[in-house]
UniProtKB/Swiss-Prot annotation:
Lineage of the species this protein comes from: Eukaryota, Fungi, Dikarya, Ascomycota, Saccharomycotina
The protein's name in its UniProt record: Uncharacterized protein YPL229W
Domain of life of the source: Eukaryota
Positions carrying Phosphoserine: S68
Annotated compartments: Cytoplasm
A GO CC annotation given for this chain: cytoplasm
Low complexity biased stretches: 40-73, 165-186
Organism: Saccharomyces cerevisiae (strain ATCC 204508 / S288c) (Baker's yeast)
Amino acid sequence: MMPYNTPPNIQEPMNFASSNPFGIIPDALSFQNFKYDRLQQQQQQQQQQQQNRTASSLQQPQQQQPISPPLFLVGAGTSENSNLNKNANTSTIPPLLFSRSSQHYVVPDIDHSSIIYKNNICKSFKDDLFFCPRSLLSLEEQQACEKMDRLTAEQMSLYHQNTQSSSNPGSMSSSPPNSASSIFNSRPKFNPYTSQSFNPLESVQE
């Protein structure tokens, strides 16, 4: 029978030459170098993690700061910003700008009086629902519109005479201005619901 191979004692030094059939003795220095390289890699990884944390902590307050809008949209009450608003409106009207602040959007100031002036909107149709061309009106309604045109022309002539008389106090106008204003205020307005041209029953009966 073969004898039982007992394991070597841990406390006793191992004889590598006798146990190793190839006669290779492990190098203790290579094992120490492996440990040293491993420690260096761990230290480098820790340093990189700390640098990344510091960089992220510095970038967070910069990202929280809101982006300031352009000068021509901030403080419309000041004189400089109002001049910038006028220049911006004459050239090109900027779109609605959404900001991160409490105000959801900023609308630039637009002078609507110039648009109304250019369109030359008639005063008699300001309060109506929609504008009806005279070609769709009946003969009686066209005659009424002609009378209204004459009254407005008379009123404008009286207004020009009054302005000239106020500029020249020597020449006084003979016609009273109150009569034209009373006629202008008492004129009837066009009602599409009572007009004969908007009667659908006539087309149905035919």
